[in-house]
Amino acid sequence: MNRSVTRRDFVWSCLGATAAAAGITGLAPSKARAVEAYRRTGSPRFLLSLAAYSFRDFFTDGNRGRKTAPDPARQIDMFKFVDFCADHGCHGAEVTSYYFPENFTGDYLLKLKRHAFLRGIEISGTAVGNTFTLPKGKKRDEQTASVKKWIDHAQLLGAPHIRVFAGTASGMTKEDAKKLCIEALEECGDYAGTKGVFLGIENHGGIVSEADDLLEIIRTVKSPWIGVNLDTGNFHTKDPYSDIAKCAPFAVNVQFKVEMQSQGQPKQEADLPRIMKILKDSNYQGYFALEYEASKDPWTEVPIWLKRMREAM
């Protein structure tokens, strides 16, 4: 007889570990049962990736409201971005949705997939801009529909992961906003599961600006295809490294920022060895993507940081 399994148990069993599930017909766990962190077998493994967001000011497509066009000599499109990843020793490329051509087709995605394969690059994921805390109605439906559309795009690209946002508690209590977010995550997570795509909710301010709130949502969502997209630069608490450590066991993707800013303190360079130790201690296995957001020229700085990350891995 089949019994309910937690989403972590489900994923664990899919990875070949000895999970407690007898089948996958009862994926939804009881809300009273806290979900455990991912229990990965084997040793920590890191696959170097680069987020297209790192070159946000230079994409020909995207940011269509930008006041000034990028320098023609330094413009880049998604194909050239994949080439950059290949030329700088990356395993993967995170193709942020903002920088795709307007009204692109499935044929465009297939050409990009083919190009990446021939350059020896995996599409490690994509990232969307969404708000899951809108009240029920047309605008909320548009948000979930957009995420589902990108789930379809990710499947076609062969991308295993999409970064999603939670949202803010605008005009409502934080608890009400969390409930709305959880409902949207479960709806989209169910759909993502039919396509074999993970959704990683990012610690991106709003109702998930602190680790405990993010983990409350993660533990409540009843989908084995939902995890944390851990952005190492997005906690601005008194001890952001502690917050990273709390969330690392739930991570399905990690985005490394070269700067961090604790509460009440100026920005400072991230302690890469310390972050690597946290990830290794949590037995993280997966993509480790540079998302360069600092003020210096990414064309100069990104290669330097990719080299440092590779050495730390």
Across the structure, where does each feature detected by a protein language model lie?
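N-terminal pre-domain/capping segments
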Residues: N2-L156, D176, E183, S223, ...
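Acidic/histidine-rich catalytic cores of soluble enzymes
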Residues: G92-A93, I182-I278
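A short helix->loop->beta-strand "cap" motif at the edges of active sites that frequently abuts
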Residues: I121, V197, S282-G286
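Active-site groove signature of glycoside hydrolases
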Residues: A154-K174, K195-H204
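A structural motif
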Residues: C90, A154, A159, A251, ...
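Glycine-/small-residue-rich active-site loops that bind phosphorylated ligands and cofactors
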Residues: F100-P101, A169, G206, F235, ...
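Short loop/turn motifs enriched for small/polar and acidic residues
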Residues: Y53, G167, D231
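Short acidic/histidine-rich active-site segments
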Residues: A289-Y292
